[in-house]
């Protein structure tokens, strides 16, 4: 018989740096999950992605056990890294803060393909290009 799901928790945690402090501790603690078990498992799984923010979906079961799925880093973070900027524009239509090439967009789209709702790479590239435009990054 399958375990009964008690909660789904979505967090964004820096790779390899999960610790019991907020936001992880309170989010897991209120469901009775062993926080250190999660932190050790997450840090072990994301050790080679150091410096990236990794979205994670934690499924908590009735017996207080858990499983988690790590996703690819957010497109905005990948675009900021590609354009070598620290943050996007406050007024993206007026102020352009950086530039990315089409090849960089294809690279990001293929990396994000499993998490995007796109049928092929061209559709994924247009999604990433839209994100870039909304951040004030020019696509060349």
Curated annotation (Swiss-Prot):
Post-translational modification: One or more lysine residues are methylated.
Keywords annotated in UniProt: Methylation, Ribonucleoprotein, Ribosomal protein, RNA-binding, rRNA-binding
Molecular function GO labels: large ribosomal subunit rRNA binding; structural constituent of ribosome
SMART domains assigned: RL11 (SM00649)
A Pfam short name: Ribosomal_L11
Any one annotated GO CC term: cytosolic large ribosomal subunit
GO biological process, one term: translation
InterPro entries listed in its UniProt record: Ribosomal_uL11 (IPR000911), Ribosomal_uL11_bac-typ (IPR006519), Ribosomal_uL11_C (IPR020783), Ribosomal_uL11_C_sf (IPR036769), Ribosomal_uL11_N (IPR020784), Ribosomal_uL11_N_sf (IPR036796)
Family the entry assigns: Belongs to the universal ribosomal protein uL11 family.
Function: Forms part of the ribosomal stalk which helps the ribosome interact with GTP-bound translation factors.
Subunit structure comment from the entry: Part of the ribosomal stalk of the 50S ribosomal subunit. Interacts with L10 and the large rRNA to form the base of the stalk. L10 forms an elongated spine to which L12 dimers bind in a sequential fashion forming a multimeric L10(L12)X complex.
Name the record gives this protein: Large ribosomal subunit protein uL11
